[in-house]
C-alpha cells in the first residue's frame, strides 16, 4: 500500500471514528431526552432510616436567566409526576381501636405572598392565585383523610370554612393581633370529634409580638353499636389537647421565639391537667430548624440560654433578596460554645421573655414530647439524622424544615406522610406549584392511643 493510500485510509478511519462518536453522542442525547419526557418521580418508603445526607446538596444556588427558563419549561412536567406516600411505624399498630390523622399546614397567607413577591420570582403567577390555591389545598387535605387540621397563615378563613364544611369539618380561627391579617385555625371532622374547650394565646399581651396560638380539647365521638346501630357513649371517652402555633419569624429575636414556644407548652400542659391529664398533640410552624436549640428545648424540656446566642437559637439564617439564593437548614449549625461574649447577648429583658423568670437562665417545660416524624423510620432522601424531614418549605431564600408534629407518650405514631426529596423540590423551581398550593408542604401523622396497644 502506498504512502498516499495509507494516509487516505487513516484519514477515512479518523472520519469514520468521529462519525461513530457523533452518532453515539446523538443517540445518548436522544435517549436522555426520551427518558426525561417519560420521567415519573415516585417516592418509595424505605424500611429503615439511613443517615448520610451529602453536604454537597447544602450549597446556595444562584439562578441564571437560562436556568430559570429551563426550570419554567420543566416545572409542570416534574410537579405533575410527584407523589407522596405514607410510611409506617416499625411496630404493628394495626389493632389500635382509636386513631386519628393530624395534618399541619402553613397555607401561605394571601397578603404575605403579595407583600413578599421576591420569594416567588420563579413561581408562575397563576400558582400564587388564591382562587386556585384554596381548591388545591382542600383537595389535598381530602386525599389524606384528615381528622384534625392545624393551619397557619390563614387570612381567608371564610373561604376555607365553606370549602371544609362541605367536607365535614368544623373549625375555629384566631387572627394575629396588630395590623397582620393572617392567623391560625384548627378544624376537626364533625362526625369524629366534639369540641369541649377552646383557648387562644395572644403573645403581645406578654410582650412577645403579635403572633397567636390555639388550644382545643377534643373528644372522640362514640362509636356505632353494631347491633342497635345507635351511638353509645363510652364511660371513658377519648380526649386530647390539640395545639396549633405559628412562631415569630425574625431570626434575631430568639428570645421572643423561645418565649412563645415556652408559653405555648405551659398553656398546653395546664389545659391537659385541667381535663384529667389527657394526651397532648401540638403542631405548627415553629420557624426553627431541627438542628436548633429551640428544637432541643422541645425534645428535652430543658435549655440553658447561656450556651446559645439568641440570634442563632432558631437555626435560621437570613439571605438578602438580591442574592437570589436559598439556604438549607441542614447546612447550618445553631449551636455555640460557652464564652463570655455570648453571655452579653442576653439582656435581662430578653432573659425574662425567654425563660419567664427574672433571675434564671434556664427555660423548662413539663410536657414529655416526642416528634411524630422521628418516631417513624424514613428514607435518607427525605429525612435528616434526627428523622425529621429535610424540607417542609421551599422558596427563593430558604429550603428546609420548620414545621412539626409533637405528641405526648399516651399517643403513638402509626404512620407519617413522607415529604418530597430536596432534589425534587429544587427541580420544581419553587413552591407553590402545579400540585402544591403553598410554599410549605403539609405534614401529617396518624396517631393512636397507646393503651389500646399495650
From Swiss-Prot:
Belongs to the CCR4/nocturin family. Mg(2+) binds at residue 153. Its cofactor is Mg(2+). Acts as a catalytic component of the CCR4-NOT core complex, which in the nucleus seems to be a general transcription factor, and in the cytoplasm the major mRNA deadenylase involved in mRNA turnover. Component of the CCR4-NOT complex, at least composed of CRR4 and CAF1 proteins. The keyword Cytoplasm applies. It is found in: Nucleus; Cytoplasm. One of its GO terms (cellular component) is cytoplasm. Its main location: nucleus. It holds the Pfam family Exo_endo_phos. One of its GO terms (molecular function) is RNA binding. Residues 61-75 have a biased composition (Basic residues). Residues 1-76 are annotated as: Disordered. Its EC number is 3.1.13.4. It catalyses: Exonucleolytic cleavage of poly(A) to 5'-AMP. The keyword Endoplasmic reticulum does not apply. Keywords: Cytoplasm, Exonuclease, Hydrolase, Magnesium, Metal-binding, Nuclease, Nucleus, Repeat, RNA-binding, Transcription, Transcription regulation. Residues 31-41 have a biased composition (Basic and acidic residues). This is Carbon catabolite repressor protein 4 homolog 5. InterPro entries: CCR4/nocturin_mRNA_transcr, Endo/exonu/phosph_ase_sf, Endo/exonuclease/phosphatase.
